[in-house]
Amino acid sequence: METSVKIVKVHTERTFAIARSSADTFERVIFEISVDGVTGRGEAAPTSHYDQDAEGVAAALEDVEVGDPWDIEGALARNSTMPPSALTALDNAMHDLAARRLGVPVYRLLGLARPEPVSAYTLGIADRETTVAYAKKLQAHRILKVKVGGWDDIETLRAVRESSEADLWVDANEAFSPEEAIEVVTELKGMGVGMIEQPVSASAGPESFQNLTEAAFPVPVIADESAITAGDVPELAGSVSGVNVKLAKCGGIRRALEMIHTARAYGMLVMLGCMVETSLGISAAAQISGLVDFVDLDGAMLLADDPYSGPLYENGLILLPDGPGLGVKPR
């Protein structure tokens, strides 16, 4: 058995801005594990918001203890102190390897039906004219997710609503105070948006979320930054409509499944999200997309230089390849 680790830089076609940051270059860490000529790959998408960077994640993966390559749970337990994005790369690579050795897609390995998710396409924060023009170019997309960071962006969203027939989701990335957020979600409800994601800081607590959820009803309010792992779900139950599960946050496919099932046990909606990732990371998440209510797996669609091929993206529809594993290969 051999393992390898490398850092790759990828670039978005447009500067990607959210409420707290903007960037057009992202470092991703690729972990590979090879057994008997078969290679499994996984991607880590570290972010400074969770105190992770590519160098630290790569160093953790260099020291990984895999053990039996079939024993995914054992490997995750042995390496549980790694940064979550590093654990994601390990988890996804081991699923890819196991499924390739068996000659089946990962979703079959997991006992799931073939998913055909329709993903939102995210519009980062920009001036009104730019955002509206970009939304018009994306008319074929069924769902647009619009990032907002202040009241000016709410007015931009209103202009998008007037120029686009797509379903609109809104992501504030913790931008508003609990008091402001009540006004914001009331305004958004009046615009007919389909979902509102993380209007307030994760530190605001369940009571603030409950007030927002009541004000927004029947529009669902989804927790993202407040919902990192399955352990966060019980505290949020009854306060939000649902949680955003991201493999890079929680630690990969197996931990994502745990989070999804926990949310379902509490009667919550589930969103499946991503970071800006290559098709390697997106394909891993897409394997379990049939289990959720909202799909936001557009990370690779935003890239100008995706180093992997496999999934096809057609106006938000993600078509997974028929091949084994994650179905992804280097370009």
Task: List PLM regions with ranges.
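Metal- or metallocofactor-binding catalytic centers and their adjacent structured scaffolds
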Residues: V5-I7, S21, I33-L102
